[in-house]
Amino acid sequence: RVVIPKEIRRTMRIREGDPLEIFTDNDGEVVFKKYSPVGELSPFAAQYADVLSRACGMTVLVCDRDRVVAAAGNCRKDFLERRISGALEDLMDKRQTHVAQPGGQNRLQPVEAVERYAAVAAPILANGDMTGAVCMVQPETGAVPSDGDIKLAQVAAAFLGKQLEE
């Protein structure tokens, strides 16, 4: 059994039950690395995000529980490898789909330090576990997503979840 101090758990956002890789380096130091199942699908997720972005005309993000692992669309470089926001983490913990409303009353900023908001955010579930989310970033015009956009995000999340199960 390995006990990780609370300060390190907070800084690295390590939650109870999070998978960790534990190994030693050449100097004999013990190294803990967070394991991301969604990160394993990164090249595949990037292709899926690209196709989805072209279909809906929005920037699309695929996130694990900590960061954006794949992005496609106009602003992809602004989002890639960035840490997700606490609001998106909370939404994922609730296993709910977020849909932007007209007038922007329920804004969700998916990524820290980027002032853009999600049109749709759908959780990725694999074997009943929360593993990440698919987000469509609202266009600058602030247009609300169509029913088709919402379904596309939900289907993408379900498909990526199934890929993780196999």
Go through each PLM region and give its residues:
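Fold-independent oxyanion-binding glycine-rich loops
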Residues: 6, 35, 102-103, 124
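Juxtadomain coupling helices with adjacent low-complexity linkers
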Residues: 39-51, 84-89, 133-166
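Structured interaction and signal-relay segments at domain junctions
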Residues: 49-113
